[in-house]
C-alpha cells in the first residue's frame, strides 16, 4: 500500500493475527523473520518494490513493539527511510483506518439423509 509520499506499508504480523484481526488493504505482507532479506535492494530474495535504499518503508506489527525494532534494523542495514506505525495495528484499528476482514469458510456438514 502506498501512503503519503510514496511510502509502502509492510505488515509483519503473523498469519494467525492477520486472520483473526483483518488485513490492511494493499499492505505488503512479510513476516518478521524474512524482512531484511526481502527488503534489502541487493538481496537475491528481494521483492520487486525493493528497488533501492531510499524506498520509504512503514512497518506495522500488532502493538508497535516488533515494528519499532524491525524499522531500526532496516535503518541499520542502510534503509534509512524505514519507520513504523506507533501503536501498531491496534492504533490503526483505533483510528478507524481501512481493514479487510477475511470471509470465514463455512465448515463442511453432512447432507440430509434420504429415506
For each feature predicted by the language model, list its residue ranges.
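Short, surface-exposed ligand- or partner-binding patches at beta-edge/loop junctions that are enriched
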Residues: 60
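Rhodanese-like catalytic fold shared by cysteine-dependent sulfurtransferases
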Residues: 1-8, 12-56, 65-115
Amino acid at each position: 500500500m502506498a501512503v503519503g509520499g510514496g511510502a509502502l506499508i509492510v505488515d509483519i504480523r503473523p498469519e494467525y493475527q492477520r486472520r483473526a484481526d483483518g488485513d490492511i488493504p494493499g499492505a505488503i505482507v512479510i513476516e518478521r523473520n524474512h524482512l531484511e532479506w526481502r527488503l534489502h535492494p541487493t538481496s537475491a530474495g528481494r521483492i520487486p518494490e525493493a528497488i533501492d535504499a531510499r524506498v520509504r518503508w512503514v512497518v506495522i506489527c500488532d502493538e508497535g513493539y516488533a515494528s519499532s525494532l524491525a524499522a531500526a534494523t532496516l535503518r541499520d542495514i542502510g534503509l534509512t527511510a524505514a519507520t513504523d506505525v506507533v501503536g501498531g495495528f491496534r492504533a490503526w484499528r483505533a483510528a478507524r483506518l481501512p481493514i479487510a476482514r477475511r470471509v470465514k469458510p463455512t465448515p463442511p456438514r453432512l447432507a440430509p439423509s434420504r429415506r
